[in-house]
Amino acid sequence: MRVNDSPSDEVYQTRLQGAQTAMKRAGIDVLALSGPDFHNYFAGLWGLPVGRPVWFVLQQYGKPAFVAPRSEAREISARCKTPVAVEWVEWEGPIAAPMTNQDALAQYTRGIAPNPGLIGLDFNCTSGANVELVRQALGAEHIKDVTPMLQELWACKDAAGIAAIRQSCDIVREQFLACRNAIAPGIPEWKVTLASVTAAIERNGELLAEDEELPRFWPHQLNMVGSGADRTARCHPSGGGRIMQDGAIAQICLCGQTFRGHAACFDRPVPIGSKPLPANLRKVIDVAREAQSAALAALRPGVTAGEIHAAAVAVIKRSGWEAPFLHRTGRGIGYSDWDGIELKAGSQTVLEVGNVLSIEPGVYVQGIGGARFGDTVLVSETGYEVLTPFDLGRNI
């Protein structure tokens, strides 16, 4: 497909059929999903700048529909082919209409399934308040969390998903180059973030070409920058006002949904200026890089997520720091910023061909600093393929 094309109707139909098969197996009569990542996965709807609930509704048989606020109905129709079946409003008009999202969802659900057994919600993406409102409207005994079912459904990426993830990786490459060019002594961190955001918008503009609807930037594109011993020893400083100093590093974290809602991960430490790095900081960097290499060496179909994490941890523990860990070794990404897999201690999740993962072990030592090398990796028949530019920024 051309880079600015959405997946074909056949791709969405295959995904819907997969969901309907899973629903029958789990005894779910109706799905009602509020998570934007699921809207994108099943219908190609992405980038609505709205906080009001939008529900994607699917039965075991038949076609899906949206239940949405009237403010977004036209926007949804412009961005995807799935119709809006019921609109809810926030004013009284001559024609009666539901005035809350839960009443609109209940009206539509009862119309298509008068006696539903179980209605599946994505609890992980739906606020607790909205879950409770839906329980009140449809009966708590009918509501079930189907987050695990959905995460299993999209754990292995299809060809269209992998193609879009590759474009996200292309964008983070441009972001990193822009970040590296902006890093210099005397410059505030936020200017590096500005360079990254601008690069992402420009590259999205090139890839999406003439498409009128899809946003070129979305807030779920993380452009995190932290410099110096204290800020890099925390894993997620975010482009503040700190002035970068010669002889230190800036840790760049480019994780997020950069292209049509598809996520990538790319992390690199970048030296600031021309002064040599302190030996103890150099050790942090070297160990972080070696830990990622160890995790990759263990990666192949059939191993568990916990085994990948253990390979990275073994390298870091040998270095003798007392408490250098702040996070897991990685996670499943691609259709969202977290697709359900966790590369963490004890995880028995067996990795499969088609999983897309972040491999990003980090080392964080207070008083010295932190470093992380992160890449987006596809599990393949022969082991893995790194989708991000692996050699870029690796040797520092």
Curated annotation (Swiss-Prot):
UniProtKB keywords: Plasmid
Signal peptide: none
Family: Belongs to the peptidase M24B family.
Pfam families for this protein: Creatinase_N, Peptidase_M24
Protein name from the UniProt record: Agropine synthesis cyclase
Keyword Ribonucleoprotein in record: no
UniProt cross-references to Gene3D superfamilies, sorted A to Z: Creatinase/methionine aminopeptidase superfamily, Creatinase/prolidase N-terminal domain
Taxonomic superkingdom: Bacteria
Gene behind the chain: ags
High-level lineage: Bacteria, Pseudomonadati, Pseudomonadota, Alphaproteobacteria, Hyphomicrobiales
Disulphide connectivity of cysteines: none
InterPro entries associated with the record: Creatin/AminoP/Spt16_N (IPR029149), Creatinase/aminopeptidase-like (IPR036005), Creatinase_N (IPR000587), Pept_M24 (IPR000994), Peptidase_M24B (IPR050659)
CDD domains xrefs: APP_MetAP
